[in-house]
């Protein structure tokens, strides 16, 4: 009888500890995604990888206007400068307690711009359908996706084109950049189509989705924008950075002014858009990472809006068509 009781107690303990181990194992594996907006305190982010990007592209191999401009003018960045700039960005994120993940390395592949590979809305991760030139990048994120509950990953049909740089999450709003031009298929810089927006409406019926038609140009960086976050971005709790001439229809620009209020909108000039002023990155509502050369913007953020600015140099990476927001894929914010 005593042996039986001991055996039962032992079996009970085994079952109990098995449950504990299973709980700890599942807690570790399942990442609880949470992105309600662009500026809440950042907890976990994927930061792109600067190493092994391969040789500079030929002019015909570029797929955005800034890269085309850089190759044409023989100023395309070299790897050591890219590594230096991304390391500085990573140091700022770590300084503020952010957990940082990276894509797995792919030799000879540009993996700097994590933003476009996937993006999170609330507790769902939407896997992007990248342009063909960038499809290989997605394979490097499998180890990240494996930590997410499969039912929280949305895989869109291949004909639904979308990239994370075109999607801005703002509480009840989703702002989505797109291209409605008849020449959509001819633009390498047209990354998000109408079909993808219609599917977002089905997956997120509670959101007010605002589609914004963007100007596109594959070769002249002053005459078009690659993604929405190159001409519009959100900071603080109710403010934005905006470039009027990035929108095909001025009514889209006016709508954004109406939503945020004109005094809450920092207006960007043509040259500032070229330098990528809108593409800063928020760690918190009162904390933004910006390029040190954005003097007018950084002063405005600090003096007018009370937002602390962490300044780093990102000049070389800017020549490749992206900046700070483009380099990140936020997974968890408070």
Positions of the model-derived regions?
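Polybasic, lysine-rich low-complexity intrinsically disordered segments
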Residues: 2-7
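The feature marks the mature, well-folded catalytic cores of soluble enzymes
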Residues: 30-334
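Short, Lys/Arg-enriched N-terminal segments with co-localized hydrophobic residues
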Residues: 16-30
């Amino acid at each position: 009888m005593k042996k039986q009781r001991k055996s039962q107690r032992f079996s009970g303990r085994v079952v109990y500890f098995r449950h504990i181990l299973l709980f700890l194992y599942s807690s570790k594996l399942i990442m609880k995604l949470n992105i309600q907006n662009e500026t809440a305190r950042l907890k976990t982010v994927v930061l792109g990888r600067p190493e092994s990007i391969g040789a500079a592209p030929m002019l015909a191999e570029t797929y955005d206007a800034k890269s085309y401009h850089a190759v044409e003018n023989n100023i395309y960045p070299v790897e050591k400068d890219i590594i230096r700039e991304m390391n500085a960005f990573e140091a700022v994120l770590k300084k503020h307690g952010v957990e940082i993940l990276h894509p797995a390395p792919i030799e000879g592949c540009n993996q700097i711009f994590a933003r476009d590979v996937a993006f999170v809305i609330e507790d769902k991760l939407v896997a992007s359908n990248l342009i063909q030139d960038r499809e290989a990048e997605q394979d490097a994120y499998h180890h990240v996706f494996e930590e997410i509950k499969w039912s929280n990953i949305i895989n869109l049909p291949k004909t639904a084109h979308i990239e994370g740089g075109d999607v801005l999450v703002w509480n009840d709003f989703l702002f989505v950049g797109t291209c409605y031009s008849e020449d959509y298929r001819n633009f390498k810089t047209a990354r998000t189509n109408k079909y993808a927006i219609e599917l977002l409406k089905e997956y997120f019926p509670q959101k007010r989705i605002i589609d914004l038609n963007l100007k596109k140009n594959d070769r002249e960086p002053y005459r078009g924008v690659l993604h929405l976050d190159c001409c519009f971005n959100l900071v603080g709790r109710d403010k934005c950075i905006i470039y009027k001439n990035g929108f095909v229809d001025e009514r889209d620009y006016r709508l954004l002014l109406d939503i945020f209020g004109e005094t809450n909108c920092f207006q960007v000039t043509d040259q500032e858009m070229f330098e990528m002023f809108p593409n800063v990155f928020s760690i918190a509502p009162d904390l933004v990472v910006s390029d040190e050369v954005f003097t007018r913007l950084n002063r405005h953020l600090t003096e007018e809006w009370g937002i602390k600015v962490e300044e780093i140099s990102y000049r070389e990476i800017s020549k490749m068509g992206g900046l700070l927001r483009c380099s990140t894929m936020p997974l968890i914010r408070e």
